[in-house]
Design a protein with these regions (language model features):
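Short, glycine-/small- and polar/acidic-enriched structural segments
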Residues: 36-219, 235-241, 264
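Periplasmic peptidoglycan-binding/tethering modules of Gram-negative envelope proteins
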Residues: 361, 374-449, 522-524
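Secondary-structure end/capping motifs
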Residues: 278-362
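Pocket-lining segment of extracytoplasmic ligand-binding domains
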Residues: 134-136, 144-145, 205, 209-313
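Periplasmic OmpA-like peptidoglycan-binding domain that tethers envelope proteins to the cell wall
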Residues: 428-429, 455-524
Length: 524
């Protein structure tokens, strides 16, 4: 477990989701190098191109790729998280003696920073594979459906591990604070989905949520967004590195949230045309195998990525290695878990977000998109134990006390009943269903400490009331643990009657009988 420093000097950010479980009458470039998603436009035969606000009069239709040819024609944008693929290939084409060559496959890699160009090429059959995030795949799902193209996403290469986030001026600490503020985002980017995710998960009114979404200021890319923030033109910016680091060095700015606290919100993977994958399952499996083998080279070999991605040209080994810290590699065990459960959940969240932004998505694609049939043949070769380098945060008792009063970034409330004067749920199945939404958020924000506070409705203090509130907090915590949440992430507190929000004899007294659940994220 890693020990975290806890201070109030801007290096530590506490992120809180409050889930008020109210006892009834009985008782939250994706990396800093990726460009934003451009509006649809005709492909420019595999070259990089800028964005445009004009949509074409015609859109590509799914063409037939040559499924007799087992060569993988793949597009990647410039991002360090794709490094294992470059390393396994030893360049843009498969080199003799490379990992892919030893596995008997050939891969042609095209560096395309424009997702519209790459997705058009995937649709027409010029490409049979492309690298995207779950966020972007959800964005493109409607386009693929309209074109009649079926795709699968059989492997993920990495999580964003701190390369993406939301920065704000001092004094802007909560989702409620976003109302009326100038919020800049790279248009149709993964960074934009971060703001929308928190807004959608909050207890703001629908009108307030829509106001924040509608008033976001759109920029062409994250660099423009970050520069506008530090030029004083914005109050809040969704962006990526190096602008997150700049915020920690600025006395009037701070990081509201970064992906160090949530691996799954932004994940990179490879999308294949289904017709190609079905025709060549062994090739897809070998491709996945090669990625896993090349993970060992992630922080030791830098010549291949430097030779094929312009952003790394002339960059030292030390600088590239430092950038590697913004992406955490995924192996067999991580892919098994993500494909089976995490990815579909995140995909649905991203569909919600894109729909709230006025885009058309294909929700049903999740039923076939995350297909593990190409991964499972490798089960005997790789361990099912995660090799993740992420470790739970370890807090001292003193640090736990310090974080109790930090302001909540995001508030979310739900209602569940306890049996009067007990810590038992009045309707367990109903309570579990309510808390499952929170468990989903907890799994997404997997780098956070969870503080559970029990409360009661009582005019006067009593030891028994204090004990009851603590037991109710523990009851909620036990359910989280039963759902797989690490108990090391949990803190339970009994407030007794010290945090009542209504007169104990009023019609609103039930509001006092609640359990508050806080997500607290501490950044180094």
């Amino acid at each position: 477990m890693k020990r975290m420093k806890l201070t109030t000097a801007g290096r530590v950010v506490i992120f809180v989701i409050v889930l008020a479980l109210l006892a009834g009458i009985g008782g939250f470039g994706y990396n800093y190098y990726k460009n934003n998603i451009a509006d649809d436009k005709p492909i420019s035969s595999g070259t990089q191109s800028g964005s445009t606000s004009q949509k074409p009069t015609t859109k590509p239709s799914a063409g037939k790729t040559d499924t007799s040819d087992p060569v993988i024609n793949l597009s990647l944008d410039e991002w360090v998280g794709w490094k294992p693929i470059i390393d396994a290939n030893q360049g843009l084409t498969t080199q003799p003696g490379s990992i892919f060559d030893q596995l008997g496959i050939k891969v042609n890699i095209n560096i395309i920073n424009d997702a519209t160009a790459s997705s058009n090429a995937l649709i027409t059959g010029e490409l049979n594979a492309a690298g995207y995030t779950t966020n972007r795949t959800a964005f493109l799902s409607g386009k693929f459906q309209e074109a009649g193209l079926d795709v699968v996403m059989p492997v993920f290469t990495n999580y964003s591990a701190g390369g993406d986030g939301i920065i704000a001026k001092s004094g802007i600490n909560t989702v409620n604070d976003l109302l009326g503020k100038k919020i800049g985002v790279p248009r149709f980017s993964e960074a934009q989905t971060l703001v929308a995710w928190f807004v959608n998960k909050s207890d703001l009114s629908d009108a307030d949520k829509q106001s924040i979404i509608d008033n976001m200021i759109l920029f062409d890319d994250a660099s423009e967004t970050g520069e506008a923030f530090f030029a004083g033109q914005l109050d809040v910016a969704a962006t990526w590195q190096p602008y997150l680091s700049y915020a920690t060095e600025n006395s009037d700015a701070h990081i509201m949230f970064s992906t160090t606290a949530s691996k799954s919100l932004i994940m990179d993977g490879i999308v294949f045309r289904s017709d190609f994958a079905q025709a060549h399952p062994d090739v897809v499996t070998a491709f996945i195998d090669g990625i896993f083998q090349a993970n060992a080279m992630y922080t030791t070999e830098f010549d291949y990525i430097r030779s094929v991605m312009p952003m790394f040209a002339g960059v030292s080994d030390e600088e590239i290695k430092a950038q590697c810290g913004d992406a955490e590699m995924m192996g067999y065990a991580e892919n098994k878990e993500v494909l089976d459960s995490t990815a579909p959940s995140v995909y649905f969240d991203m569909c919600d977000i894109w729909e709230s932004l006025g885009e058309t998505v294909n929700r049903k694609a999740a039923m076939t998109l995350f297909d593990n049939q190409y991964l499972l043949p490798l089960a005997s070769k790789y361990s099912s134990t995660s090799t993740s380098t992420s470790k739970p945060v370890e807090l001292t008792e003193e640090q736990k006390q310090e974080i109790v009063n930090y302001e909540a970034l995001l508030t979310k409330s739900m209602t569940v009943e306890f049996v009067a004067d007990t810590a038992q749920f009045k309707n367990p199945e109903e309570a579990y269903a309510i808390m499952d939404e929170f468990v989903s958020i907890a799994n997404t924000l997997d780098g956070a400490i969870i503080q559970v506070e029990g409360n009661i409705n009582a005019r006067n203090y009593s030891d028994s009331g204090q004990a009851l509130s603590a037991e109710r907090a523990k009851a909620v915590a036990k359910y989280f643990i039963a759902c797989g949440i690490d108990p090391n992430r949990l803190i339970t507190v009994g407030n007794g009657n010290t945090k009542m929000v209504a007169d104990p004899g009023s019609a609103d007294a039930y509001l006092n009988r609640r359990t508050d659940v806080f997500f607290k994220i501490i950044e180094e």
